[in-house]
Amino acid sequence: GPPCCLYGSCRPFPGCYNALCCRK
């Protein structure tokens, strides 16, 4: 599936959300 994080921002996908992605 697609990565949870793209371009340094929080990008949730269906069934793939990681709060750690929100870190800069």
Swiss-Prot record:
Disulphides: C4-C16, C5-C21, C10-C22
Domain of life: Eukaryota
Gene Ontology CC annotations of this record: extracellular region; host cell postsynaptic membrane
GO terms for MF: acetylcholine receptor inhibitor activity; ion channel regulator activity; toxin activity
Protein name in the entry: Psi-conotoxin PIIIF
Family under the similarity heading: Belongs to the conotoxin M superfamily.
Summary of the tissues where the protein is detected: Expressed by the venom duct.
